[in-house]
């Protein structure tokens, strides 16, 4: 029998988002063994169950109220949303927040030896894709008629196999397209992972747990986007040094023993510190510059 007091979260069992989703939950302090083949894994330290399923099942589980939360790519979520609307349904869910992983783009690609004069080049053509609804919405907005060839995998081989004239598929580096004699010609949708919640009334204990989880996720993402910086900085150029390092709060300034011309400065910077920034700090007279990763962060 299902325990309705436990928060149920669906995530991808294997694939593009699986490792990052697992890492996010671990960094949020959820102790769970996700290295087994079991469909449902129970957290050791929180009333949370993790359902490990196919990515295209996750929006369905959330929209149908089977699970409380889902970690899913926006591309899969939007495709299912359009699919249900096309069938006359009114799917309900909440997007709690966008996450900082799973970035990709859904793009049109054509054979490298064919001319490209914009989307109109696809008028009347056959296009292979795993995202027929996103493709249709985009080309309908352009007033372009086309024939759809639905494939659930290996979309990039369709033109070479004579199944389609072009493809619409996810792209990260473009290496797979190049290996199959294709080139990316148009981006139709940009996607990241997101956290979604089912519609409907939520038990107070579950909602409190969701709020706690959101706070921790915010802390994890902030920590990944921030660095803890320590340095010795000249007193007379302190404002210039601080201007190079935008942060959530003002830095901590400490005196240096026996040195009236410099101070020790500690701060959390909200931007990734590149070598160019460190070189600018050094040019302003800063020294002993240390840039450290942050494990956890809460403002």
Swiss-Prot record:
MF GO annotations: ATP binding; ATP phosphoribosyltransferase activity; magnesium ion binding
Pathway: Amino-acid biosynthesis; L-histidine biosynthesis; L-histidine from 5-phospho-alpha-D-ribose 1-diphosphate: step 1/9
Gene coding for it: hisG
Protein's name in the database: ATP phosphoribosyltransferase
Regulation: Feedback inhibited by histidine.
Gene3D superfamilies named among the record's database cross-references: 3.30.70.120, Periplasmic binding protein-like II
Cleavable signal peptide: none
Subunit: Equilibrium between an active dimeric form, an inactive hexameric form and higher aggregates. Interconversion between the various forms is largely reversible and is influenced by the natural substrates and inhibitors of the enzyme.
Record-linked PANTHER family: ATP PHOSPHORIBOSYLTRANSFERASE, ATP PHOSPHORIBOSYLTRANSFERASE ATP-PRTASE
One GO CC term, this protein: cytoplasm
Protein's cellular compartments: Cytoplasm
Protein's GO biological process: L-histidine biosynthetic process
Keywords: Amino-acid biosynthesis, ATP-binding, Cytoplasm, Glycosyltransferase, Histidine biosynthesis, Magnesium, Metal-binding, Nucleotide-binding, Transferase
Transferase recorded as keyword: yes
Primary subcellular site in the record, as a coarse category: cytoplasm
InterPro entries recorded: ATP-PRT_HisG_long (IPR020621), ATP_PRibTrfase_cat (IPR013820), ATP_PRibTrfase_CS (IPR018198), ATP_PRibTrfase_HisG (IPR001348), HisG_C (IPR013115), N-reg_PII-like_a/b (IPR011322), N-reg_PII/ATP_PRibTrfase_C (IPR015867)
E.C. code: 2.4.2.17
Catalytic reactions of this protein: 1-(5-phospho-beta-D-ribosyl)-ATP + diphosphate = 5-phospho-alpha-D-ribose 1-diphosphate + ATP
Cofactor (UniProt): Mg(2+)
Protein role: Catalyzes the condensation of ATP and 5-phosphoribose 1-diphosphate to form N'-(5'-phosphoribosyl)-ATP (PR-ATP). Has a crucial role in the pathway because the rate of histidine biosynthesis seems to be controlled primarily by regulation of HisG enzymatic activity.
Family, similarity comment: Belongs to the ATP phosphoribosyltransferase family. Long subfamily.
Superkingdom to which the source organism belongs: Bacteria
